[in-house]
């Protein structure tokens, strides 16, 4: 297995899981990556070299990469800029990541979904099967309206509970099953009504365990 780390500034690397020694609970931890002063680790995944990483950009495009294609780096390296690994436009930025199983497995891709949320409260659900045929230049994942941008993308089983939180302090929860699957070029439907034009969605989570707790942290 490997550990994939992604920093806020968009640096990515994979490191063998064996480089991380088991510690007792309450320890000080180990260094996972070297970052610049203004950068910090933002995402971490554990997977295998044969899994796929899906990258979703703020303009609504999706790019693929096999995990083994992600540059390998030690715990003390910062990794490579994602912008240099995929054919992303210069004024675009990767906003969300999904680590999936084999995209050639028809049973798998037909039973999982990608649900996306935008800054202005749109949500869209699409079958994972529609992302199973990689193209070097990426594909359109969602049509983004003017002044909006993609914020989050999550992999779901079709029966999750979806929660959206907005900057003004409100949140909404709804059943994913009530959101019908759409094609990749659709712009989605309203997930939450914003307070005013200055309000925006700040996060989305998908929950399968109805006994789970949600931790909300303000700045």
Which role fits each region the language model picked out?
Residues 1-219:
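Short, structured "edge-of-domain" segments at secondary-structure transitions
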